């Protein structure tokens, strides 16, 4: 599968590229973080049920983003720096991006419980501002990764090394949320990306997702996005 980006990653002979799954994860972060400020802004005062629902969604995204960043920093940049003499300026920009994201996530973590407790509109408005800033900075960071880093993956990583990175990044996902993550990755996938991803899912898990998981994902996201 050839993943279309500003500067596409190099394809292997069978038409796939190692970084294709990371591109799908990036789509999840972009979409969900972009939508979250509007969803939070739409919560009326005292609607603690909606605040709690969106709070859980934010925490899941924040946990996923932190694990993704740790795997990216520990297993991606270092190896590329060793093997390709990764531009120190690019590496420093990526590190700055992570520090910026960590600061914003820390602010959100500190305020979220206050908002979930009583859905106070003043706290809500502050959250919206920070969530908007986070979404913008993360999207910019992911674009830089896709254009300046991922094109090097197929040339300098083995399948085993890339699998190790993927397992590290996905280490946060409990078994009962695997179907959610699969649904999230498939939501904006192209036909080629969908075939490539589903081809890596074990047959029993693929069948279970099609029988139960897909419907559960759609139902959950419809509830979450009800006010979008």
Residue ranges and their predicted role:
Residues 1-228:
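Small-residue-biased structural context
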């Amino acid at each position: 599968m050839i993943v279309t980006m500003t500067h596409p990653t190099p394809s292997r002979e069978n038409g796939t590229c190692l970084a294709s799954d990371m591109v799908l994860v990036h789509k999840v972060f972009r979409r969900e973080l972009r939508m979250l400020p509007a969803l939070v802004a739409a919560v009326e005062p005292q609607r603690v049920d909606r605040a709690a629902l969106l709070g859980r969604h934010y925490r899941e995204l924040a946990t996923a983003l932190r694990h993704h960043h740790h795997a990216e920093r520990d297993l991606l940049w270092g190896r590329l720096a060793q093997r390709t003499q990764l531009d120190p300026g690019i590496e420093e920009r990526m590190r700055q991006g992570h520090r910026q994201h960590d600061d914003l996530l820390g602010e959100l973590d500190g305020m979220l419980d206050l908002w979930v407790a009583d859905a106070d509109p003043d706290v809500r408005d502050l959250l919206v501002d920070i969530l908007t800033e986070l979404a913008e900075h993360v999207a910019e960071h992911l674009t830089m990764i896709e254009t300046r880093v991922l094109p090097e993956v197929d040339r300098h990583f083995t399948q085993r090394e890339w699998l190790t990175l993927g397992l590290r990044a996905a280490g946060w996902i409990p078994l009962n949320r695997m179907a959610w993550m699969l649904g999230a990755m498939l939501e904006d996938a192209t036909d080629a990306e969908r075939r490539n991803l589903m081809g890596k899912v074990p047959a029993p898990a693929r069948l279970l997702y099609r029988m139960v998981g897909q419907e559960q994902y759609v139902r959950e996201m419809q509830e979450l996005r009800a006010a979008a």
